[in-house]
Every structure is written in C-alpha cells, then in structure tokens.
Amino acid sequence: MARYEKQEKKDFVRKNEQIRVPQVRLIDSDGTMLGVKSVTEALYLAKQQELDLVEISPTAEPPVCKILDYSKYLYEQGKKLKDAKKKTAKTAMKELRIKSRIASHDLEVKIKHIEDFLKRKDMVRLVVVFHGRENQHRDLGEQMLHDVAKRLEPIANVEGGLQVTGNRMSMIFVPKN
C-alpha cells in the first residue's frame, strides 16, 4: 500500500515561456512602467538584460509582468512570508486545575504560575474541580475564582466570565496589552 505525502499548495508563478497571453503590461527591472507589450517583445527585452519575465499579477487585464531575477524574486517572497509568520501573535491556552479545598500556599504557587503564563502572553484557564460531596459547596469554588480574578486584575482580563460544566468551574484569563 502506497503512502501519499500531503503536498503543500504553492502559489505558482509563471515565468518566461510559461506566460501564454498575447499582451502583458510590462514593468522594467528598475520599476518603470513600459506599457502594454506583446509577450514576445517582453521576453526579448528580458533576455537582453539577462533577466526573467515574471508574471506578477495574473488576474489583471492585461496581466502585469515584471523583468527581474526569478531566483531573487522567490527569495524575497519567502522572506516576506517568514516575516509575516513572525508578526502573527502566537498565544497558547494554558490550563491549571485545582481542587476546591486547596491549601492557601498551594493556591499562591498556582497564582504565581498563572502570572508567569500571562507575562508570556499566554491565555490561562483556571479550573476548579469538585469531587463527591464538594459539589454541595460550589460557592467556595466560585468565591476562590473571583478572589483570583481580583488578584490578577492588574495584569489580566477575565474572558467570558465564570463557566460551569459538570463538576468543573472555570475562568479564562487573558493578558492585558
């Protein structure tokens, strides 16, 4: 049985003889507009400069082509893509679980962890888990979450308020910008 690898969809850029339209809007290597030219004339001008004719905007009417070095163009496109990836915010959701009868020092340690996560710009979900008869005292868990929210107020906002699901009660903290 053959295993197929997932292929990434690449933006295909036509160059030189791959351009099959009769006329193109031509831009020179220094950025000056040369106007609408036939493809053969544009290819001739590109070969004179020992560069490639690259289709920049295939959807335009007529398509826009530029005379440039194709390998340099691909390098710059890759560089732009990497810069765009760097600029996108990467926020992760961290989850901390505690019991409703947690000791005060243990809660302090958990709050320190939450503060560290928030300083790294991560979102934090604090979950209080109730076991057995603890379900009768959900108000203690709710009070604990509100106390933590008050304590983290200078560095975090609460998103969505208090959420109750089954035997869990949670609150999501988002770092302030």
UniProtKB/Swiss-Prot annotation:
It is found in: Cytoplasm. Pfam families: IF3_C, IF3_N. Monomer. It comes from Elusimicrobium minutum (strain Pei191). PROSITE patterns: IF3 (PS00938). The lineage of its organism: Bacteria, Pseudomonadati, Elusimicrobiota, Elusimicrobia, Elusimicrobiales. HAMAP family: IF_3 (MF_00080). PANTHER family: TRANSLATION INITIATION FACTOR IF-3 (PTHR10938), TRANSLATION INITIATION FACTOR IF-3, MITOCHONDRIAL (PTHR10938:SF0). One of its GO terms (biological process) is ribosome disassembly. The gene is infC. One of its GO terms (molecular function) is translation initiation factor activity. InterPro entries: T_IF-3_C_sf (IPR036788), T_IF-3_N_sf (IPR036787), Translation_initiation_fac3_CS (IPR019813), Translation_initiation_fac_3 (IPR001288), Translation_initiation_fac_3_C (IPR019815), Translation_initiation_fac_3_N (IPR019814). Its main location: cytoplasm. This is Translation initiation factor IF-3.
